[in-house]
């Protein structure tokens, strides 16, 4: 009787320890459809500046993305006293958990990871081939500008791409001033006679003179203006403001015309 009681007592703690281990296994092994997956992304400057940044790679399965997580989990478990390895049994997505203790835990972890990779070898080969095809397509396509080129703060039109400096147009040189008209003696004599008659020309009179002297109306108009200005300077008539300034010594401009100027000027 005493031996049976001792055996029952030994069995009970074993059952309790087994239940605790089963609870731990169930806690760490949720269903395959609800396994949380962490996506690893590299936010380095070199990757951000590339044109293909942000595009989703084709041909990479979900299991390939979890390789790194399984490897890191195996290494961290090898350092601890108890190690649990998730091993996919088949295509259904179910997995079994193996607890390993002792010196052989690192070897078993490596073997299980190699087996799991062996099961998915076809997927890795297909992903490698797809990546090579995408790289060859990228080389065939023309060079794409990175995204930061279209987001510069100095661009007035961000969607138009990088700015190209336009060559400056050569400034059109101004035409030289019209040379002075060299009037003939007959033309000057006729203009002087008309000026003595009347210093200001009407439109009809200017048109008739232009036809008679074979000149432009503007040439006749300019000659009359210059003639009036010369006479005004020669007479020396000054307005009241000029006289007031001269009394204060502030107005000393010469108003007499120089001798020797021809009427053609």
Swiss-Prot record:
Residue numbers spanned by region Disordered: 1-38, 75-140, 156-181
Biased composition (Low complexity): 122-136
Annotated compartments: Nucleus
Keyword Magnesium tagged: no
Pfam families in the record: Engrail_1_C_sig, Homeodomain
PANTHER family attached to this UniProt entry: HOMEOBOX PROTEIN ENGRAILED (PTHR24341), HOMEOBOX PROTEIN ENGRAILED-2 (PTHR24341:SF5)
Family: Belongs to the engrailed homeobox family.
Name this protein carries in UniProt: Homeobox protein engrailed-2-A
Species of provenance: Xenopus laevis
